[in-house]
Structure formats: structure tokens, C-alpha cells
Design a protein with these regions (language model features):
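ASCE RecA-like P-loop NTPase motor cores
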Residues: 1-171
Length: 171
């Protein structure tokens, strides 16, 4: 501009578009063949590594033996955030043996009930009213963010950053 005015670019993420991007990616990875992708401005931005995304998909089913804390860790690794008060997209909450998950790509939330280290019940429910929609025998949860990555890549990046930091300090 002629006035030497800097105009800051706004790179804010529209929550609804992000939800649709995650929904599309999840549907494609689930094997659905009836997906239509319509271009939007968000298409100019990259997505994460599809292998990392699919490696962070969580599958649960009634009768499956899994420690509740291990499942919570898997949810955190898939970029879900624990929030027992503000239950919104991409969050989960825990109360005793009950785990509620609100996927970032869905308007339906899911309740997983444990009996010791076994999944006893899986239900879908309306996250606003809390009313039960249906009982499920299994559930597939896709990552809460398209930029999910592996622990190995995080460790490598952390080590590289630390080495760079030490080099800068010496410099």
C-alpha cells in the first residue's frame, strides 16, 4: 500500500469449516464411497499426514478389554482435550466409569461405560439435551484435529529444537 501500512493477514480457523474438513477426512478413511468434496478457501491449506491421521483412529466395542486410563491417553494422543465442564467439539469428559466423547466432526456425542477394564455399554446422545439416541455395539473415533502426528515425530522434533537451542546459546 502507498501509505506503508501493514495489513495483518487473518489466519483464523472457521470452526464449522474445520468440522466439515474433519468429517470429510473421517468419512474417506472409513471407506465410504459416497463422498463429494466441494472446493472452498480451506482447500488451499494443507492437511496433516494421512498415515498419522489413520494411525490415531480409535476403535472400541462392547466387551473389549481396555484400561480406561489407556483409552483417555489414546484420546489425548488423537488431540481430544479433557474438559469436564465445557463439553464441546473435540473434547471428552469423565465421571467415574463413564466417558463422554464429542467428536470434532460430528453433532452427536458418545458415551462409553466401563465395568472395570471392559467396555460395558456404548451409546450415542444429543450433547445439548443429553438424551440418548441409540445403543451401539462398536464405535470408531477419528482424531479431533487434522494435524495429529505420531509420538516419534514429536520426540524427534523436540530433540531437534533442543539441539538448535543449545547451538544458539553457544553462538
Amino acid at each position: 500500500p502507498q501509505t506503508n501500512t501493514y495489513i495483518e493477514k487473518d489466519l483464523s480457523i472457521n470452526d464449522e469449516i474445520e468440522k466439515l474438513r474433519l468429517s470429510t477426512t473421517s468419512s474417506l478413511l472409513s471407506g465410504r464411497r459416497d463422498i463429494i468434496v466441494v472446493s472452498s478457501v480451506s482447500c488451499i491449506y494443507g492437511i496433516g499426514n494421512p498415515d498419522d491421521f489413520s494411525n490415531n483412529v480409535i476403535s472400541v466395542e462392547i466387551g473389549k478389554k481396555i484400561n480406561r486410563d489407556d483409552l483417555l491417553r489414546q484420546l489425548s494422543d488423537s488431540l481430544y482435550s479433557r474438559n469436564d465442564i465445557d463439553f464441546t467439539h473435540g473434547k471428552f469428559r469423565v465421571k467415574g466409569d463413564t466417558l463422554d466423547v464429542f467428536p470434532a466432526y460430528s453433532d452427536i456425542a458418545y458415551r462409553i461405560i466401563f465395568w472395570d477394564d471392559e467396555i460395558e455399554e456404548i451409546d450415542s446422545f444429543n450433547p445439548i439435551t443429553g438424551s440418548r439416541i441409540e445403543s451401539l455395539s462398536s464405535l470408531t473415533l477419528f482424531p479431533a484435529n487434522i494435524f495429529v502426528t505420531s509420538k516419534d515425530k514429536i520426540k524427534t522434533a523436540t530433540n531437534d529444537i533442543q539441539l538448535d537451542m543449545f547451538k544458539q546459546v553457544e553462538y
